[in-house]
Amino acid sequence: WLEWEKKYRKPTKSQKAVIERDLEDEILYEKFLQWTFFRQWSQLKAYANERDILLIGDIPIFVSGDSSDVWAEPRLFQVDSDGFPTVVAGVPPDYFSATGQLWGNPLYDWKYHKKTNYTWWMDRFKTQFLLSDIVRIDHFRGLESYWEIPADSETALNGKWVDGPKDDFFETLIQSFGEEPPIIAEDLGIITDEVRALRDKFGLP
């Protein structure tokens, strides 16, 4: 979508109405595909659960820059007025890579997420809990602190650690889904005492 015409990249409310009308057939087709998938998946999940099999789903912490999420809600991300990221995700240098890993995903504007009581995130978890019995948070450590890299960097060397939402995020999660939400914390990468403390405080395996 970053290469679309401006009226499609950043449509006004009235332009959205025109787009929805002009692309009605295409939109309905995509909705049908989504409905078909969810119907088939719910049947598969029911089949597994009836046989005492639990499904573990993955929720990656970051989304792609060209995703519908960034297009629909650019305020949730650190992007410029055209939708391009100003800082991106990655990890610092380690034993496996002398220059780190430059993932390129746009980073969240956590201050804005906090103002909205993490509504987008809670909706995301709500959907994932419908699809899976247990949810694994991919790159859990990024909710404690994450590696922020200038978007014009060619490697991850110029990054820095920035605080994530930490306790506040998980307290909101508990308020939304109960004391023991079915979550697994992935612990790959640079795991510090602070990351372990956050995991243990909320009893996440």
Protein language model features and the residues they cover:
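Conserved, well-ordered alpha-helix/loop/beta-strand core segments that scaffold catalytic motifs
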Residues: E30, W35-V63
